[in-house]
Amino acid sequence: MFLLYEYDIFWAFLIISSVIPILAFFISGVLAPISKGPEKLSSYESGIEPMGDAWLQFRIRYYMFALVFVVFDVETVFLYPWAMSFDVLGVSVFIEALIFVLILIVGSVYAWRKGALEWS
């Protein structure tokens, strides 16, 4: 059976780090003046009236690069703790990490074949 008292600091940190932003939003909503006029509802760019349309289209390539970056960033987040405790975990966890890396390699080859990594 797990002894959960070892995680008291984690739970306290989680609760405090969740309560502080909620309180900040609540207090700012209560204390902020409510004034909705035409100036409040108009858009601006750096304090001046906007020139042109407010909606700009961006290329889908930015989205694809961001998606591939997130995949490899998450891979790093998962593999770093494994690498730090490699000598303690054993062979079974090594095999699981290899399977994880192989799945990510298959995904990156798929993205490469589909042209997600090309900037043309």
Curated annotation (Swiss-Prot):
The keyword NADP is annotated on this UniProt entry: yes
Keywords: Chloroplast, Membrane, NAD, NADP, Plastid, Plastoquinone, Quinone, Thylakoid, Translocase, Transmembrane, Transmembrane helix, Transport
Record GO terms (molecular function): NADH dehydrogenase (ubiquinone) activity; quinone binding
One GO process term, biological-process aspect: photosynthesis, light reaction
Transmembrane segments: 9-29, 64-84, 88-108
GO cellular component: chloroplast thylakoid membrane; NADH dehydrogenase complex
E.C. numbers: 7.1.1.-
Reactions this protein catalyses: a plastoquinone + NADH + (n+1) H(+)(in) = a plastoquinol + NAD(+) + n H(+)(out); a plastoquinone + NADPH + (n+1) H(+)(in) = a plastoquinol + NADP(+) + n H(+)(out)
Topology within the bilayer: Multi-pass membrane protein
Subcellular location: Plastid, Chloroplast thylakoid membrane
Keyword ATP-binding belongs to the record: no
Family, as annotated: Belongs to the complex I subunit 3 family.
Subunit relationships: NDH is composed of at least 16 different subunits, 5 of which are encoded in the nucleus.
PANTHER family cross-referenced by the UniProt entry: NADH-UBIQUINONE OXIDOREDUCTASE CHAIN 3
Reported function: NDH shuttles electrons from NAD(P)H:plastoquinone, via FMN and iron-sulfur (Fe-S) centers, to quinones in the photosynthetic chain and possibly in a chloroplast respiratory chain. The immediate electron acceptor for the enzyme in this species is believed to be plastoquinone. Couples the redox reaction to proton translocation, and thus conserves the redox energy in a proton gradient.
Name of this chain's protein: NAD(P)H-quinone oxidoreductase subunit 3, chloroplastic
